[in-house]
Amino acid sequence: MSAVNTPADFNDYKVADMSLAAWGRRETFIAESEMPALMGLRRKYAAEQPLKGAKILGCIHMTIQTAVLIETLVALGAEVRWSSCNIFSTQDQAAAAIAAAGIPVFAWKGETEEEYEWCLEQTILKDGAPWDANMILDDGGDLTELLHKKYPAILDRVHGVTEETTTGVHRLLDMLAKGELKIPAINVNDSVTKSKNDNKYGCRHSLNDAIKRGTDHLLSGKQALVIGYGDVGKGSSQSLRQEGMIVKVSEVDPICAMQACMDGFEVVSPFIDGVNDGTEASIDKALLGKIDLIVTTTGNVNVCDANMLKALKKRAVVCNIGHFDNEIDTAFMRKNWAWEEVKPQVHKVHRTGAGAFDAQNDDYLILLAEGRLVNLGNATGHPSRIMDGSFANQVLAQIFLFGQKYADLSPAQKAERLTVEVLPKKLDEEVALEMVRGFGGVVTQLTKTQADYIGVTVEGPFKPHAYRY
């Protein structure tokens, strides 16, 4: 898509401001130059058109990088309808650029919960009736859940869903275990070129950026507590350490806790002896009373609960880089404490009660992005080079599932293929190779003798399925 050239009669969209489209297009051009894997897939599959006939319902953060993803899907033959998976994550110039290209999109930064639900519905509906979609691309699982609960008939012709995040994958696995999942899914999140890039290196880049944009604080010498040490927690801990913070980590998984120790982080618990009995008496107030910044990274619920929030140091910064706002008990904060907006997505939450507050009061917490994704609420998320790997995985996963034609199978065949699986390793390696080439790197090829010696082919895949990178 080379220019802003909206069809005169096109109105199948809702964005904040169409005058931002030219700006969004300029930023998209820059992003394309930083996304070699995605652009490589456009070139590689342009003639083949592997997504011709695909009608994709997409729900993922409507950023500049997502604009490149959307236009790659379209370039490979797909039709799409799009919304954002987070009320604060849309970059309005990106949404405008996509609408200007004649692609249905329903997203703007600062949606209410009701508007968010409306946007999801508009993704599904065309001219007031369910669109004849046959593929889903999701981030977090809200779109997938809505289709299963409210529009199950659509799923009869859907070949599958590709899911971007840890949270969404958990929801899919739960649905599968309960017998509720009606279509196969590709777990894009656990592709190596997604989890090690997006979750780890992306958070390493974007977390400190968001905190500094939101607060203008110097982070050096201050104490941080990172809740969780999975890939997101690892990247987040590195992000804060490289700013000079004294970083402590809280974990429930002994293996991840061991990794944190080996990486040089002190493993602590906000609860005395690690046990949360639901009372304030179980809180390690001495620890939390020294914490200047707390970051949740888990994808789990209430990992920063009301009792922890009560015990935190005055004026501490609280934020989340997991998925939903329920990692932090923001419901308790809204019910019991007064909120003062400093600027969009930055609030002073006064712990002196729910009524009027004294602006000079110093017993407050600084909450970023209302407990939602801080890197997209207070900044622009991961850089294009990081999202290149994630979105190249999405494209290959869409091609793979669309080619499997699940909706056309017999009931017996469907029963066999109703799974939640990661992308085949060979495709993961294809993404990685394009990314390495984008850096100007050269990958060494095995000789036939070397390949035979370790039991692989010269072309790969090079590692067994269970290999942990």
Swiss-Prot record:
PROSITE patterns (alphabetical): ADOHCYASE_1, ADOHCYASE_2
Binding site for NAD(+): 165-167, 199, 228-233, 251, 300, 321-323, 375
Location in the cell: Cytoplasm
Enzyme class: hydrolase
GO cellular component, one term: cytosol
Free-text cofactor note: Binds 1 NAD(+) per subunit.
Enzyme Commission number: 3.13.2.1
Pathway(s) per entry: Amino-acid biosynthesis; L-homocysteine biosynthesis; L-homocysteine from S-adenosyl-L-homocysteine: step 1/1
Keywords recorded for this protein, A-Z: Cytoplasm, Hydrolase, NAD, One-carbon metabolism
Binding residue positions for substrate: T63, D139, E164, K194, D198
Keyword flag Cytoplasm: yes
GO aspect biological process, one term: one-carbon metabolic process
Required cofactor names: NAD(+)
PANTHER family assigned: ADENOSYLHOMOCYSTEINASE
Xref: NCBIfam families: ahcY, PRK05476.2-3
Family: Belongs to the adenosylhomocysteinase family.
UniProt protein name: Adenosylhomocysteinase
Source organism (scientific name): Pseudomonas fluorescens (strain SBW25)
Organism lineage: Bacteria, Pseudomonadati, Pseudomonadota, Gammaproteobacteria, Pseudomonadales
